[in-house]
Amino acid sequence: MFVALLTAISSFADGKYVVIDGLRFFVRTDTKEAILFDNSYSGNITVPEKITDEGVEYTVTSFANGCFSNCKSLTSVSIPSSVTSIGSWCFAYCEELKSITIPSSVTSLGEVCF
């Protein structure tokens, strides 16, 4: 159990949170992946396929659990083809959401995603 805990801590330590163009990501420095995280999003959101932080490029591969949850004035989301998974409760309680573009690259949708 101690080894598993150290592994989990090590995995989390290999990254950091960044905000790029109003979108909050956790970037994994080991795999060069970016995970979209929660924030107070509103209006029309276009998630980029790649982001750059401090000269390093990261590919956006997933949306964290609840990343858009309770964003009551979110109206549309465009998801890039680099994304393969969308977490649980990702779009829950988005009362004004009228349009979402989900590419065929998304192979995993979490529970109660909408």
Regions found by a protein language model. Name each.
Residues V19-T31:
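Short, ordered beta-strand-loop transition motifs
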Residues S11-G15, I20:
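Boundary at the C-terminal end of the N-terminal hydrophobic targeting segment
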Residues T29-N44:
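Secondary-structure transition/turn motif
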